[in-house]
Amino acid sequence: MLLHCNVSYYTSTFSFISSSLRRQDNADDSQDTVIRRRHNARSISLYIRHNRDLKLNKNPNESQETFVPPPPPPRRDLDGENRSKLLELSLVTRRTPQFPGSIYAQSASDADIASSLPSLRNFLGSDGDDDGESEREMIVKALEIRRKVTKEIIKESLVRKGRFGITYATNVTDRLGDFVDHVMIQAAALKRLPEFSESRFNLRARTVIEDSNFVPLVRWLKHHELSYNRIAKIICMSKGNLDSIRIMIEWLKSIHVKGEFIAVAFLRSGDNILQRNREELNEIVEYLESNGVRRDWMGYVVGRCPELLSFSMEEVKSRVDFFLKMGMNQNDFGTMVYDYPKIIGFFSFQVMEKKINYLKEFGLSTEEVGRLLAYKPHLMGCSIEERWKPLVKYFYYLGIPKEGMKRILVVKPILYCIDLEKTIAPKVRFLQEMGIPNEAIGNMLVKFPSLLTNSLYKKIRPVVIFLLTRAGVTQKDIGKVIAMDPALLGCSIGTKLEPNMRYYISLGIRFYQLGEMIADFPMLLRYNVDNLRPKYRYLRRTMIRPLQDLIEFPRFFSYSLERRIIPRHTIMVENRVNFKLRYMLACTDEEFERRVRDKVERRERFEAGLDSEDSQPSDENISDQEIAFSDEAEEEEDLTE
């Protein structure tokens, strides 16, 4: 009811307004008074709608007429620049807005968006006026424009269907050169099919992209932590067969290849990896597994040496036999490949033979080279000219003989792999600045090759500063201490040097006395404190010796309590003789027995009155060479590095 009232009201209002307007329009000119009516927003909208309906009713047949496009203009001779512009307009997918009055302006009401544009045939070979070179240039330009169109279609598919960002889609598309050409060729080939004979290029290109499952594959590869650069390279490697990528990745995952190494295995295993038979790849994996490479190691090995996947089975067998003939067993070979996977597939046979022959020049046999490579296979990755020869010359400069170089190679082969200028030379210069001569430095390196692997600023310098400031070693003796025991530079300050220093200070040894003891016997700071306590307790309580004897002979702590100190002290007590600690311990058993007999004979002769006390020989007549010789024969079991 309310709706009916409103309609009646609007109808009456509109009739009244229309009648008033008609009266106003048909009024006589002689009329003196003109009544002008003002319309509000509601009435004026009704008036405008009424007039529009009247105009449409006057020509009812005009709206049913169909638009007939004008005939195409005759072909005109255009210069190269205009031809390129028109060519691009005829190929691009998205049209740029044209200014009013443009010849090739397009509107959204066109039935075919390309109806107002010139045909591509108008440019290529319809007339024989242009020469062949110009036509070839136009064909090349047409292909470039079509390639740009294909890129835009691929980018649009990634953004709309794959929900990728514009930046990511652009980065992927810009690197898909081969795949763009593949899509362009396949889209052109679809025009031969009846169902696509009348379709446009854009539709055919989208059909090719959808049928190849391109967008889901990109999403799947991104899920496997592959960068857009590697995704594009892998897709280009497939040559349009995108299904082979999924099959290959599933196989790599079956042998435990993970993360970014999946892309590494693709890109470094050769262009034919997607065409290889899976049975051949499984045969290679099983052969390596039978020679010591565990199944759970296989992903690590293949991910870091994907060249294995490009080898034939015969070449893999020859490479494995190359190392097994050097005396390696299967366990050594398996651990060697796991430690350095490149050794099995990255280097050629000529390069490996050359490096093995160079290692033999140090005096190593074939079996020793095999054990060396099994222990440190990274040697195979070092260059002879850039690493080994400069290092050998530097060792000769320090006075290290060939045997010393061989010992360094066997004990610490990693020294032949590190950089000479950045790692080794600064440490040698630091030792030279402490006053250590080159020959002594060479002996230090032969004795303790690990010195060159320690950090200069985190290990070596802090230990030197500790010896100077906390252990009482003077600047005059610091070079001597380091030269005598370079292993000190590899000790931890917090767990080894600091506890030992505090223990000696707790015994009553003064700061400067401790420095003198260390200068005399630097290994004092490297012993285990738990092994030092029973020796000191026996010295003070059983032997009843003063602390000064220990200060004068700090090597006392280097001898075994059960095998040397207690047996010799027992012999001295039984024979009622006494020696200083130096002459009691720093000799062999035969020499000690001879000294005891001589001491007993002198005492008996003195008691018999045959010799005076002044005529008895002193113990100081024993030379330091005998002490040094006996120290070399002593087994220092209490020392812990």
Curated annotation (Swiss-Prot):
Disruption phenotype: Embryo defective. Developmental arrest of the embryo at transition from the globular to heart stage. Pfam families: mTERF. Residues 610-641 have a biased composition (Acidic residues). Keywords: Chloroplast, Plastid, Transcription, Transcription regulation, Transcription termination, Transit peptide. It is found in: Plastid, Chloroplast. Residues 54-80, 606-641 are annotated as: Disordered. One of its GO terms (molecular function) is double-stranded DNA binding. GO terms for cellular component: chloroplast; plasmodesma. GO terms for biological process: DNA-templated transcription termination; regulation of DNA-templated transcription. Transcription termination factor involved in processing of plastid transcripts. Essential for embryogenesis. Belongs to the mTERF family. This is Transcription termination factor MTERF2, chloroplastic.
